[in-house]
């Protein structure tokens, strides 16, 4: 009988990381929280990479696999995290300007962020588990979810229509 490595094992690893890291982070303390790197890919197997200072999702093969960005994760609350790349030096942020809501990378050190600051709310994402996958909802813009397009090599963005077939809002993780 052939054994299958289930994505559920990745989710369990991620949840164990969160529960362990929560004890390492004091909600009101100044002690830095523990950051860990994870591989992230959507349910269509697209991974994240940086192109022209923009986070995109696509199918990396051969020598291009080295371009894959690991997602740096710092837990804020039991189901909330800060997300970054490049060793936590670039953080994912939800920015609202007028009627437009967009995802952008900001040059901020992920371990300098604090859940007690209102200004850092734009960097906070709420985790929602659905079986072996996880979705990320913006804390600053409720109802807006991290997503990838169905087409490869498109920017990682946000959508307020997670059920829409044109956007993918479910992701897998693998602890590095």
Swiss-Prot record:
Q: Where is the protein localized?
A: Secreted
Q: Which residues are tagged as glycosylated in the record?
A: 109
GO MF annotation list: cytokine activity; interleukin-1 type I receptor antagonist activity; interleukin-1 type II receptor antagonist activity; interleukin-1, type I receptor binding; interleukin-1, type II receptor binding
Disulfide-bonded cysteine pairs: these are 91-141
Q: Which residues form the signal peptide?
A: 1-25
Record keywords, A-Z:
Disulfide bond, Glycoprotein, Secreted, Signal
One cellular component term (GO) for this entry is:
extracellular space
Q: Which GO terms describe its biological process?
A: immune response; inflammatory response; insulin secretion; lipid metabolic process; negative regulation of heterotypic cell-cell adhesion; negative regulation of interleukin-1-mediated signaling pathway; response to glucocorticoid
What's this chain's function?
Anti-inflammatory antagonist of interleukin-1 family of proinflammatory cytokines such as interleukin-1beta/IL1B and interleukin-1alpha/IL1A. Protects from immune dysregulation and uncontrolled systemic inflammation triggered by IL1 for a range of innate stimulatory agents such as pathogens.
Similarity comment text for this entry = Belongs to the IL-1 family.
What is this protein's record name?
Interleukin-1 receptor antagonist protein
Q: Which organism is it from?
A: Canis lupus familiaris
> Which gene is annotated as encoding this protein in its UniProt record?
IL1RN
